[in-house]
């Protein structure tokens, strides 16, 4: 079974890494070099953004 294709674009992931303060780690060592805590915070922030967008879309109806 192949790996599941990512839902987040690379551009969005880099933007989150910059916002959360570990972009230099990604730039210098790749995504495999980030801490599990940083990866978790990135997913948490992505979910928050998605929820905000969904709420905004629902309010615009």
Curated annotation (Swiss-Prot):
* Pfam annotation, one family: SASP
Query: Where is the site labelled Cleavage?
Result: 15-16
Biological process terms from the Gene Ontology for this record are: DNA topological change; sporulation resulting in formation of a cellular spore
Out of the domains of life, which is the source? Bacteria
Q: Which keywords accompany this UniProt record?
A: DNA-binding, Sporulation
- Gene source species: Bacillus subtilis (strain 168)
Q: Does the keyword ATP-binding apply?
A: no
Cited function: May play some important role in either sporulation or the dormant spore.
Q: State the name under which the record lists this protein.
A: Protein SspF
Q: Which gene encodes it?
A: sspF
The record ties this protein, via InterPro entries, to: SASP_alpha/beta-type, SASP_alpha/beta-type_CS, SASP_sf_alpha/beta
């Amino acid at each position: 079974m192949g790996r599941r294709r990512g839902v987040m674009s690379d551009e969005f992931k880099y933007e989150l890494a910059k916002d959360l303060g570990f972009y230099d780690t990604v730039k210098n060592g790749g995504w495999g070099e980030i801490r599990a805590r940083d990866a978790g915070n990135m997913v948490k922030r992505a979910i928050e953004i998605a929820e905000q967008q969904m709420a905004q879309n629902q309010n615009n109806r």
